Every structure is written in structure tokens, then in C-alpha cells.
Regions:
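A glycine-rich beta-to-alpha transition motif near the start of alpha/beta enzyme domains, typified by
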Residues: 89-105
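Conserved phosphate-binding/catalytic loop of the ribokinase/pfkB sugar-kinase fold
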Residues: 114-118, 123-163
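Glycine-rich phosphate/adenosyl-contacting loop at the front of the ribokinase-like
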Residues: 2-84
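Conserved small/polar residues in nucleotide/adenosyl-binding loops
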Residues: 165-167
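A structural signal for isolated positions on well-ordered beta-strands in alpha/beta enzyme cores
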Residues: 30, 84-88, 111, 125
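A glycine-rich helix N-cap at a beta->alpha junction
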Residues: 101, 105-117
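Short, glycine/serine-rich, charged loops/turns that create anion-binding
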Residues: 36, 90, 131
Length: 167
């Protein structure tokens, strides 16, 4: 069975993007976007809470990774492209971890503003399975910690102005 017309069109578009990207890896790619930390807490949910019918997660391990535009920047770097990311993090532990993770992988972080008294966005996912099952992990909860206020206008203008120099 072959591809549908829609699938064939998507296939051709993806191949055109790959061909374009592979033509010239010497150019700069500028990314402007949200920068966040993704956290994953894995464990077993064998019991229900005695006070409410919700699973009790017994943690087995945690993982952290950069998310959103930072994830794309790291991916481009791993493919051999010179990318530069522009965005903002808070002056907190999560922001410092993001910068450390990106710098460890060779991503240029000079376009990331560190904003005092701002919370870096952290998205935590709690995933669980039954201890007796080999597979079948399921998302129990996503817990977001993020700033309610937009990035200050002066910081946004500085990020945009700096990014334009690199285009």
C-alpha cells in the first residue's frame, strides 16, 4: 500500500527541508523563543492514597533536559549547524542548569538574557507504571512552574535587537 496524497506531499516537503539544510551548514541559524527546563520523574504507582483516590508515586529516577527553543538549538548543534539562541531565563537554579547544559554541548548562549527576580519556566512530568509490569509507563501529572508576567519590554527589545545583528 502506498502513501496517500497528503502523506506524499508531507514527505516531499520534509525531503525539501532536509535538502535545503544539507546544502549549506556554514550559515548561521538564529532561534528566538521560549527557553525552559523539562524534568521527568519516573516511578511506580502500585497504591492509591488513603485520603483521595489518586496514585502514590514511588520515585525511581529523575531526568532533566532543556526544552522548547533550547532543545531545538541543541539539536541543530548536534547536526553540525551553527545556531544562536535568543531568549530569557530567570536568575535561578533552573536558568543556570539550562545554560550549563547548553554550554556543555557547545551551544552559544550569549543571546540568552538572565533576568533578575524572574522564575525560569520548568515543566515537570510525573510518569508511572506498575512495578509488576515490564512496560506501560503513563503520564500521571504535568506540573508547570512559570512566570505569570511577560518578559519586560526593555529585555525583549534588547533580545530582538541583538538577534537582528546575527541574521
Amino acid at each position: 500500500m502506498g502513501m496517500t496524497d497528503v502523506e506524499l506531499e508531507q514527505h516531499d516537503k520534509l525531503n525539501a527541508i532536509i535538502e535545503t539544510l544539507n546544502k549549506d551548514k556554514t550559515g548561521n541559524i538564529v532561534l528566538i523563543g521560549d527557553i525552559m527546563l523539562d524534568c521527568y520523574i519516573h516511578g511506580y504507582a502500585n497504591n492509591l492514597n488513603s485520603r483521595a483516590p489518586v496514585p502514590v508515586l514511588r520515585e525511581t529516577h529523575r531526568e532533566e533536559d532543556v526544552g522548547a527553543a533550547a532543545h531545538v538549538a541543541r539539536g541543530l548543534q548536534s547536526m553540525g549547524y551553527r545556531g544562536k539562541i535568543f531568549g530569557a531565563v530567570g536568575d535561578d537554579k533552573a536558568g543556570a542548569k539550562i545554560l550549563e547544559y547548553l554550554e556543555d554541548e557547545g551551544v552559544n548562549t550569549t543571546g540568552i538574557a538572565i533576568i533578575e527576580d524572574r522564575i525560569t519556566t520548568v515543566k515537570t512530568r510525573m510518569l508511572a507504571s506498575r512495578e509488576s509490569l515490564v512496560q506501560g509507563e503513563q503520564l500521571l501529572l504535568r506540573w508547570d512552574v512559570e512566570e505569570d508576567e511577560p518578559i519586560p519590554e526593555m529585555a525583549l527589545e534588547a533580545i530582538y535587537d541583538l538577534s537582528l545583528i546575527h541574521i
